[in-house]
């Protein structure tokens, strides 16, 4: 099956350090831990989005986004164990294919849009912005300790997918996009 965690607490992190999958101990504010934490936060919020999509019967979106939770867990594994590679280019291509398909249905943007219109649209934008934050944390780590594999490309493409997903959710719900209105000029 998979990995089993028989003990949840170890007390080894009580003094501000944590262990990586390769056995190293690092401070809990180490850039690698920051990156892992941002990916974990994104994954948690993606779970909230998926629960809402399932409840709303938006199974097409669930079918595309549910595997992303697993791939984010894979990315976390890659970050925790630098020699471990789980993601591959086919995962990035899968996201690009869906983006192109959904974007063709939606058509071009005429204006900037704001997160909102419905709770699900807003939650998709929360996930998108968290994907960008996770990407920044991963890029910061990459500048210090170069990352192997396609994780950086995956997280970048995932944020694009989540933007397009937000638009598609609105379309499926019959909710108009909230267009940005520039401040009046004095």
Regions flagged by a language model, labelled:
Residues 1-186:
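Phosphate/pyrophosphate-binding loop motifs in nucleotide- or prenyl diphosphate-using proteins
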